[in-house]
Amino acid sequence: MAGIGFELKKLFRRKGLFASLRAYGYAGIICTGPMLLGVVLQLGILLLCSWVGAPRDQQDLLVCMITYTLLFSLTVTSFFSMPVTRYLADMLYEEQEHTILPSFWGSGSLMLVLGCPLYGLFLLVSGATLLQGLLCLWLFAEMIVNWNGMSYLTAIKDYRGILCSFLAAIALAFGLGAVLVVLLGCPVLEGMLFAVAMGYGLMMIWDVVLLYRYFPQSDASPWAFLRWVDAFLPLAFTGLCTNLGLFAHLVICWAGPVGVQVKGLFYGAAYYDVPALIAFLTILITSVNFVVSVEVNFYPKYRNYYSLFNDGGVVGDIVTAEEEMLAVLNRELRFTALKQLFATAAVLSLEGTLLDLLPLGFNDLMHGYFRTLCVGYGLYAVGNTLLMILLYFTDYRGAVAAAAVFAASAGGLTALSMAFDPAFYGFGFLIGAALFYLVALFRLDAFTSNLPYRVLGRQPIVAESRSGWFTRLGLFLEHHKGTEREEKKNES
């Protein structure tokens, strides 16, 4: 992400309000792509359904199906996204670009094989019709490929191409939905699901074309990345736990007193979901700032510091470089926290006026949820920034510990809050996010207090290679692929 941050930084050097707005627009879409696209599509589809006079139960079921598909796909990809990103970074550093495309298809295939049967089984017993289930499964498969592709797209630094794929997906989904439902008279639920699936499908094709334009095709093993999953297993659980902590409170509230059974196993809690959806947008400030400010300003100091160890720098230069790096890091983290604080305070002061202007039917309970979740998401955003810095310093144990605390506390405390008045439901996530922030902060402070020891003293004396279940799976798949090649050669 630092690479694309440097590209986006060029936009911020241009003067003028329009240039700044365009730069922040690019950064916001790229940095929070999956969730932002989901939010825009959800809100747009609701407006379109209201415009055509769709029954409320159909609207609720449509939102539930898209939300379930989105969360299922993000959960599956969250386990593999960080190890795959690490593999991608290592291959680019070693100038082995020919391994990139095979790993993209290998990782995507594995996620599809793991995720589609599980989600398909859920759809079978969920109460959805056959057509609705097939459309949801199709959308799920597209989302898996898209979210996996986001890790690869940031490497090519083509932010305009990424932006165009997002805009094209939204335009096609809305346009096709209007044609199917308004002009052709198709059923609202099935027509809009098909339109959304086509929109995500266009984005998938667009992104794959971008990848093929930048990376060469080759016969390299598509399963080599699995060794990275074993070698960096804490990264996999860091991604999974962060995802669980971020979304568990929503699922728990669906099953709580404010939840409503829409159809079969599809539940929703509009009084909680809508405030959470809008409150989530407040973290855009920190997400954008991390890429275009924290990483861009911190990374050169970070690279210089570690290059002194690799290139035989003298002790005095190393000490000076460490002081400069940590000074820049502390300054950027402080500015990030202040920006998020001001953004949250501004939203809280204006939310009563602005939200009442929207046709969302906010009541006092929803306003309370919104205020609570705004603070919670703000703490999460800053805590997630600290988590990313821990990953920069390869403190994978500290990162997975912070993420695990977040997942356990946010989910556990939200479940505990179900025994109290509904007004307290959002506090479980808020406290979990606060603990996430504090654990990450204290861990980063402890880790950087003795950085030379962390860099040198904790390294293994001899090289270690971890061979676990994923490595064995990769060897098995590669052996199977080699056997098929031999059979084809013999036949020819």
Predicted regions span which residues?
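Transmembrane helical elements of multi-pass membrane transporters/channels
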Residues: A195-G199, M203-E295
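Small-residue-rich midsections of specific transmembrane alpha-helices
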Residues: V63-A89, N243, F247, A276-K301
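Hydrophobic alpha-helical transmembrane segments
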Residues: S165-Y212, A423-D445
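Alpha-helical transmembrane segments of multi-pass membrane proteins
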Residues: T67-F72, G108-V113, L121-L153, A343-S349, ...
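N-terminal membrane topogenesis motif
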Residues: M1-Q42, D60, C64, L226-L235, ...
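Specific pore-lining/lateral-gate transmembrane helices of multi-pass inner-membrane transport
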Residues: L92-F104, D273-L357
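Alpha-helical transmembrane segments of multi-pass membrane transporters/permeases
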Residues: L153-V179, L390-G412
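Hydrophobic faces of transmembrane alpha-helices in multi-pass small-molecule transporters and flippases
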Residues: S20-L36, L163, S221-A248, L333-F342, ...
